[in-house]
From Swiss-Prot:
Gene Ontology process terms (BP): DNA replication
Crosslink site: Glycyl lysine isopeptide (Lys-Gly) (interchain with G-Cter in SUMO): 551
SF3 helicase domain segment(s): 444-594
Protein name per Swiss-Prot or TrEMBL: Replication protein E1
Motif (Nuclear localization signal): 83-85
Purpose: ATP-dependent DNA 3'-5' helicase required for initiation of viral DNA replication. It forms a complex with the viral E2 protein. The E1-E2 complex binds to the replication origin which contains binding sites for both proteins. During the initial step, a dimer of E1 interacts with a dimer of protein E2 leading to a complex that binds the viral origin of replication with high specificity. Then, a second dimer of E1 displaces the E2 dimer in an ATP-dependent manner to form the E1 tetramer.
Length: 642
């Protein structure tokens, strides 16, 4: 073997290079404490002294990280914008009408131009694809994650791929269970129900613990109008529920709103009183627009107004923190939740009804029934009247008793007292001058008229009949009717003269009037009623009653026939006080009377000319006014001392 190549030791100058100086310590130089002076230098500290890796500038790393963050932020905003767009869309939201979503899935724009419905087969085929479509909210993220796990780790049948294990298979199974119960799937199942109404009613009872029929009464027609409505809505999105309370305030006077959550989404129960009456169709359209749900997901009926249980439910729910209540509580809730109405069932008292009718001057049966029924909200006796099965009998009895009391009161009063009694029920803004001017306008001496009018009111025999004659449209009937109305008199008509009872109203009046007497009427008066015109007592036949003897009240007769020109009625001349109205009744350019003849002016007329009519008052009335006690038919309560 040849010798190793290289320089020979000891030849030339190579021997000088092998000399190595060993320095023990140099003066004035401090050795670092980190260095061990006794350790041999083996060269291990020079390992990886040179870095052969790729050098990347620091600025480039920061720029790359910033770019990644910007791209992630942009992607997040794009996804959020897409979700916002699809959230309110009636074609994508599972809380909306999914039938329209099926029609528009292939091409929304083309579907919007269709003039008729598509084939039912295509709709059924699209149900499966609709269930797996991302709706933009809910469990869509879980569904996407499930697909990623299946693609990366194995097949849907549970076989594992590379790096897979039992934990991943378990996660896939859980995601599959969640994915089959998404909000979209649940609403589709709701639409597939054969009896949707029964399903909604069952879900309502499951959530609220009572039947929907316990709170409402049914309207057969969708066009029946009502101000109070109970609305139950299913499948409402939570974002709509947050702002619904504010949106509905503008349309309602009172709202009672409850929100619950279930597998279908948010469920609304609302009692609402609108500002005006609405029917079910109008309410349904408004709720569909505000809640973004179809009409078949709504239950709309009016509330039970006479149910104590329903009223207590709304009252108890309104004071809890589960409800949002705005506005004034309806009166039907207040009426049935007050303690005295809940624990004390008031019995009907006829005397209270009669006293009310007497105080309000109601004598007709129809007026009594209508007005008293309207008091049921504030009067417990009226409420008991409505609950009774004998309302017609009570109304008839009340009217009879009220007329008896009024008739007895009138007969006990003299003419001056009656005029004062009627004046108390009339306003004080009248003027007596139009009546005086109208009398003078007809060419009648006012003093002569007042002399005859005084005897007429005092019912002096042979002076108690006032006859007004003249051409048509001269104001005769207007003048007489206005006076009869003020004094609450009665009117008789000659058309009923063939009846035996046509004079019966004269038995219950302080003044009477026979309007437009024709020649046959004058002949009848001359033949049968001379003593009636005299003001003497006469016999009058009454229906279902025995004959009665009455004194005819002051009687006003208007006629276009002047009996002074006919000699056949000469026996009536001394029994009447006749005045002629020759001039037409004056009207202004607007068709209103120039001389107003109303109750206020007649009151002022009597007050002005009271002394001229020679009405005498008793000393007690002059000093103390009216001393008569107010009529009272309701029995009082006796206060017993202890």
């Amino acid at each position: 073997m040849a010798d190793d190549t290289g320089t020979e030791e000891g030849l030339g100058c190579s021997g000088w290079f092998s000399v190595e100086a060993i320095v023990e310590r140099t003066t004035e130089n401090t050795i670092s404490d980190d260095e061990d002076e006794n350790v041999e230098d083996s060269g291990l500290d020079l390992v990886d002294f040179v870095d052969d890796s790729r050098i990347i500038p620091t600025n480039q790393l920061k720029a790359q990280a910033l770019l990644n963050r910007q791209q992630a932020h942009a992607d997040k905003e794009a996804v959020q914008a897409l979700k916002r767009k699809l959230l309110g869309s009636p074609y994508e939201s599972p809380a909306s009408d999914l039938q329209e979503s099926i029609n528009k899935e292939l091409s929304p724009r083309l579907g919007g131009l269709q003039l008729c419905r598509g084939s039912q087969g295509a709709k059924r085929r699209l149900f499966q694809s609709l269930e797996n479509r991302d709706s933009g909210y809910g469990y869509s993220e879980v569904e996407i994650r499930q697909e990623q796990v299946e693609n990366g780790h194995g097949a849907p049948d549970g076989s594992m791929g590379n790096g897979g294990g039992m934990g991943s298979v378990h996660g896939v199974q859980e995601n599959q269970e969640i994915g089959t119960n998404t909000p979209t799937t649940r609403v589709v199942e709701l639409l597939k129900c054969k009896n949707l109404q029964a399903t909604l009613l069952g879900k309502f009872k499951e959530l609220f613990g009572l039947s929907f029929g316990d709170l409402v009464r049914q309207f057969k027609s969708d066009k029946s109008s009502c101000t109070d409505w109970v609305v139950a809505a299913f499948g409402v999105h939570h974002s709509i529920a947050e702002g619904f309370n504010t949106l509905i305030k503008a349309e309602a006077l009172y709202t009672h709103i409850q929100w619950l959550t279930c597998t279908w989404g948010m469920v609304l129960l609302m009692l609402i009183r609108f500002k005006c009456g609405k029917n079910r169709t109008t309410v349904s359209k408004g709720m569909c627009k505000l809640l973004n749900i179809p009409a078949n997901q709504l239950l709309i009926e009016p509330p039970r107004l006479q149910s104590v249980a329903a009223a207590i439910y709304w009252f108890r729910a309104g004071i809890s923190n589960a409800s949002v209540v705005t506005g004034e509580t309806p009166e039907w809730i207040q009426r049935q939740t007050i303690v005295e109405h809940c624990f004390a069932d008031t019995q009907f008292n006829l005397t209270e009804m009669v006293q009310w009718a007497y105080d309000n001057d109601l004598t007709e049966d129809s007026d009594i029934a209508y007005e008293y029924a309207q008091r049921a909200d504030t009067d417990s006796n009226a409420a008991a009247f409505l609950k009774s099965n004998c309302q017609a009998k009570y109304v008839k009895d009340c009217g009879i008793m009220c007329r008896h009391y009024k008739k007895a009161q009138m007969k006990r009063m003299s003419m001056p007292q009656w005029i004062k009694h009627r004046s108390e029920r009339t306003g004080d803004n009248g003027d007596w001058r139009p009546i005086v001017k109208f009398i003078r306008y007809q060419g009648i001496d006012f003093l002569t008229f007042m002399s005859a009018f005084k005897k007429f009111l005092h019912n002096i025999p042979k002076k108690s009949c006032l006859v007004l004659i003249g051409p048509p449209n001269t104001g005769k009937s207007q003048f007489g009717m206005s006076l009869v109305k003020f004094l609450a008199g009665t009117v008789i008509s000659f058309v009923n003269s063939h009846s035996h009872f046509w004079l019966q109203p004269l038995d219950s009046a302080k003044i009477a009037m026979l309007d437009d007497a024709t020649p046959p009427c004058w002949t009848y008066l001359d033949t049968y009623l001379r003593n009636l015109l005299d003001g003497n007592p006469c016999s009058i036949d009454r229906k279902h009653k025995a004959l009665t003897v009455v004194k005819c009240p002051p009687l006003i007769i208007t006629s276009n026939t002047d009996i002074r020109t006919e000699d056949r009625w000469k026996y009536l001349y001394s029994r009447i006080s006749l005045f002629e109205f020759p001039n037409p009744f004056p009207l202004d350019k607007n068709g209103n009377p120039v001389y107003v003849l109303n109750d206020e002016n007649w009151k002022s007329f009597f007050q002005r000319l009271w002394s001229s009519l020679e009405f005498q008052e008793s000393e007690d009335e002059e000093e103390n006014g009216d001393t008569g006690q107010t009529f009272r038919c309701v029995p009082g309560t006796v206060v017993r001392t202890v």
